[in-house]
Amino acid sequence: MTWSATARGAHQPDNTAFTQQRLPAWQPLLSAGIALPLFFCAGLAFIGLGLGLFYSSNGIKELEYDYTGNPGTGDCSVCAAKGQGRAPPPGCACSWSFTLPELFPGPVYLYYELSNFYQNNRRYGVSRDDAQLSGLASALRHPANECAPYQFRSDGLPIAPCGAIANSLFNDSFSLWHQRQPSDPFVEVPLDRTAIAWWTDYHVKFRNPPLVNGSLALAFRGTAPPPNWHRPVYELSPDPNNTGFINQDFVVWMRTAALPTFRKLYARIRQGNYSAGLPRGTYRVNITYNYPVRAFGGHKLIILSNISWMGGKNPFLGIAYLVVGSLCIVMGFVMLVVYIRYQDQDDDDNDDE
């Protein structure tokens, strides 16, 4: 068989400008007249965006209270002392009182914050069974091996929901009360606990197993709750649309955080007389203290915050834009000085020639 340079092989591409990489190309020549305006314009744009983001973040109001219960920090220290690093006795309660001299504009969001809690630990992050959480009946009885040691109870019953993430579910609870005048009684502020989880989590990723004779409790028969839970998953809420694997608090907790200090949404305040925000007056947050954090050196906070078009309070993004914009301006001036200095030398060299 003779070989021909023009013969097309089985794997030879078409003889086109695209496949043979003969398309026309253009490469800009970055002269000083082009590069310097680009640096200055980019710097001004970044600084403008940074100022807008920073101003918007500073306009967000926040109230926070550390109720970890360190000695001498209020009545929550009594609950923390009773637990001695573990969960305190059931029903231990404390409170936080504060006064608002003016309207706290809404919409107002209630968060809890944990610190020194590494949900991003690999073994912790994979300790779950997504098939079980999606309501698959076979996974309910046979949890994934990743859930170990929270896969089966000591008597052999499968744990539902299994895994370390579910076992460490945050279980403090809060209620907010308002007193308009010193002589008035405290009135409970309605907390909207619905739609606090991501839409995709609540409607797609988390599903309850099929009901048995119309009962969710029968669907979970033959399973055990996680060791740290005081009640089974089907009793998380009396609302049938907010219990089991689709409980909003549970779904929010199961979306793990990337950093050791994180906030999770607990409720919105947007109903009745509080749709525009929190009116002035005295407020009291009643806290049911259940969750132990002192054993791992953590802290827990309750936070009231409103939001802006960019979300919650986060000055980092605005500061980052300001830093990048300032660096662009500084580098532009440095290159301008270098250009002016060495341009004169080039002109002198050309005159000598």
Swiss-Prot record:
It is a multi-pass membrane protein. The keyword Electron transport does not apply. It holds the Pfam family CDC50. Residues 1-33, 337-353 are cytoplasmic. One of its GO terms (biological process) is positive regulation of protein exit from endoplasmic reticulum. Glycans are attached at residues 213, 286. It comes from the Eukaryota. One of its GO terms (cellular component) is plasma membrane. It is found in: Cell membrane. GO terms for molecular function: aminophospholipid flippase activity. Residues 55-315 are exoplasmic loop. Keywords: Cell membrane, Glycoprotein, Lipid transport, Membrane, Transmembrane, Transmembrane helix, Transport. Disulfide bonds: none annotated. Component of a P4-ATPase flippase complex which consists of a catalytic alpha subunit and an accessory beta subunit. Interacts with alpha subunits ATP8A1, ATP8B1, ATP8B2 and ATP8B4. Accessory component of a P4-ATPase flippase complex which catalyzes the hydrolysis of ATP coupled to the transport of aminophospholipids from the outer to the inner leaflet of various membranes and ensures the maintenance of asymmetric distribution of phospholipids. Phospholipid translocation also seems to be implicated in vesicle formation and in uptake of lipid signaling molecules. The beta subunit may assist in binding of the phospholipid substrate. Can mediate the export of alpha subunits ATP8A1, ATP8B1, ATP8B2 and ATP8B4 from the ER to the plasma membrane. PANTHER family: CELL CYCLE CONTROL PROTEIN 50, CELL CYCLE CONTROL PROTEIN 50B. Belongs to the CDC50/LEM3 family. This is Cell cycle control protein 50B. It comes from Mus musculus (Mouse). The lineage of its organism: Eukaryota, Metazoa, Chordata, Craniata, Vertebrata.
